[in-house]
Amino acid sequence: MKKISLWMLSVGLLCGTACLGSCNRNAEADNADKTAVQDTIEVKKKVGFLAAVDNYLMDSFGSQYSPGSVCIPSVEVIGTNEENPDSVVVWGDFWVFNYNLVGDTLKTVSGGDHPGKMCVVKGKDGKFHVTTFEQVEDGHGNLESAKRIFGDQYEKFHAFNSNEEKREEARVRDLVYFLKVNKLPYKHYQDYGWPARELTVNSEQ
């Protein structure tokens, strides 16, 4: 699991889902925003197997990082095997970010990257659930495990994962989606040590 400090995010993000640390912020405004979020947000998720991917990332990894007001994954699907529509294999670069909501800005608190392969199966309840997740290793085994897990899709994964601009585009895309489906007014996001960046909430992404 690739954990990233907020300091590292400020130096090297977006490599994209998250860093450990805390944002400088006004505590009173922060608490007010957290309360508002808890009272008003019903997190609406993507449909089908992508909903299960988001849920898994939030539940399994978002909770491991320093908490924020809201957890928003960033998922770049590298490839899928949907031969069996009730048992889908998803290869992806999976990021998780926790944010505090301050004014009109999503302020990054923590997050990390969890690339790998998920098996997502439709249960008796008609909903998809992640049943297995094989994650790329950190450190010495990183390259070998990435090539093994992604197979002939490794080059596609590497091209995305090593491209900061592409990672940032994917992150913004998923932030915009989250804001749209939840009808939230936030217009910017901000990583620690960086100026706030505008979110194009009217985008059709």
Please place each PLM-identified region on the residue numbering.
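Positively charged n-region of N-terminal signal peptides that target proteins for export
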Residues: 1-4
